[in-house]
Regions:
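Extreme N-terminal signal-anchor transmembrane helix of membrane signaling/transducer proteins, especially
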Residues: 1-12
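Extracellular/periplasmic ligand-binding regions of membrane signal-transduction receptors
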Residues: 23-57, 92
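Helix-start (N-cap) segments at beta->loop->alpha junctions
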Residues: 128, 142, 150-167
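Short hydrophobic beta-strand segments that form the core of ligand-binding sensory/regulatory domains
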Residues: 137, 148-150
Length: 167
């Protein structure tokens, strides 16, 4: 019985370390994005829906930054409204990606916290199959939240390591 309880305690500690790593990675990515993405510019892009040279420079930096870690699946900047999320930047370059001004309806997890998303409140990560999405508010120069930086972190590598650990 003691061996089983030690294994369980070690496993719980291992899970906590992995969760802390994922949280830390997402926060580091978001903080770096805050250095690149100007909240006041986000408001301007949302209003006029026009891309300029500065827009593309930021977008390319976000794509480059996403590519620095295999665990960072996606970086987006999104403003939530009644109809869904209005995208400013999205680093998903597949057909599933969004462009400036695209509005995507709320998914099931987002719909459950729709009011918090519209208010740009701090929320817990949303869990999807194989990923955790972290929503970190982006503020204007007046310290008013204008959008979220959404960082999608892979949980597949952690799951593989867990299976190896348990195997």
């Amino acid at each position: 019985i003691m061996d089983v309880s030690f294994i369980f305690v070690n496993y719980v500690n291992y899970m906590n370390v992995n969760r802390n790593y994922t949280d830390s990675l997402a926060q580091t990515v978001a903080n770096t994005c805050r250095l690149v993405v100007d909240g006041d510019s986000v408001t301007g892009y949302l209003d006029n829906r026009r891309r300029n040279t500065a827009y593309y420079e930021v977008w390319n930096k976000l794509i480059d930054y996403r590519n620095t870690s295999e665990n960072v699946l996606q970086i987006s900047v999104v403003n939530f409204r009644d109809g869904g999320g209005c995208y400013v930047y999205d680093t998903d370059l597949t057909e599933n990606g969004a462009f400036l001004g695209d509005i995507r309806p709320y998914d099931e997890a987002q719909n459950a916290i729709k009011d918090e998303l519209i208010a740009c409140e701090k929320i817990e990560p949303l869990e999807y199959n194989g990923r955790s999405d972290y929503y970190i508010p982006l503020n204007s120069s007046y310290n008013i939240p204008v959008a979220y930086i959404i960082v999608g972190i892979s949980t597949e590598n952690v799951r593989r390591e867990q299976l190896t650990y348990l195997g």
